[in-house]
């Protein structure tokens, strides 16, 4: 089920399995949810809005310009550009596979996944005003991640998440990878350049505990040493 708010421009081609969304007003958002499976669809969202939203979330508690919630997905492609919401793309309680995720020029976070189980082939995110990737409360496997120009964190992992990453390339970012709040991450290979801190591990919320991080091949060039809060385990 596709729900829109404040009438964004939407074009759906069921034969090609494509959804094209254009946002031209600050409060416009799109929510895709419901029973069934979204199989081999391509979703694209663009925007001409330059202003910040006055509130982080709306009356429906949606933070994404594009939100997928309570839905199964298979081999979908998502692209988002010039988004102004708290999250350009937000997946909530979503399970399945993403073939490609491309996000450019987000005013705040690029990709945010909450309480989901996802297997993602390719992630390309450029120029996010906060975090490029935020993974919370779920199980996530990512094959290839390319991140550039993340004002705060390249990859933020929290709320008891379990994450496996094969290869990630991160540059022009404050913190390459942050692991928080009882989360676990295994990264096969990381290559980071022009970052302030490679790895930060800490507890942000009192109800959680320390975290675990393992990086098998670490080629990270940072300006400062890693921050590993007492109790967390890091091998890299």
What are these regions (language model features)?
Residues 1-236:
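Extracellular beta-rich repeat passengers
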């Amino acid at each position: 089920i596709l729900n829109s708010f404040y009438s964004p421009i939407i074009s759906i081609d069921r034969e090609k399995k494509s959804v094209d969304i254009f946002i031209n007003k600050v409060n416009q958002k799109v929510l895709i949810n419901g029973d069934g499976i979204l199989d081999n669809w391509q979703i694209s969202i663009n925007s001409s809005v330059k202003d910040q939203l006055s509130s982080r979330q709306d009356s429906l508690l949606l933070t994404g310009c594009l939100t997928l919630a309570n839905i199964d997905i298979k081999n979908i492609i998502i692209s988002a550009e010039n988004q102004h919401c708290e999250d350009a793309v937000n997946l909530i309680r979503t399970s399945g596979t993403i073939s490609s995720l491309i996000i450019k020029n987000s005013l705040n976070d690029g990709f945010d996944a909450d309480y989901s189980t996802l297997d993602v082939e390719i992630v390309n995110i450029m120029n996010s005003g906060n975090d490029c990737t935020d993974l919370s409360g779920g199980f996530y496997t990512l094959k290839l991640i390319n991140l550039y120009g993340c004002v705060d964190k390249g990859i933020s992992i929290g709320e008891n998440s379990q994450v496996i990453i094969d290869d990630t390339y991160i540059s022009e970012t404050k913190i390459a990878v942050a692991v928080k709040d009882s989360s676990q991450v295994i990264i096969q290979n990381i290559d980071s350049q022009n970052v302030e801190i490679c790895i930060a591990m800490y507890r942000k919320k009192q109800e959680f505990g320390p975290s675990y991080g393992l990086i098998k091949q670490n080629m990270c060039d940072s300006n400062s040493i890693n921050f590993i809060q007492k109790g967390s385990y890091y091998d890299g």
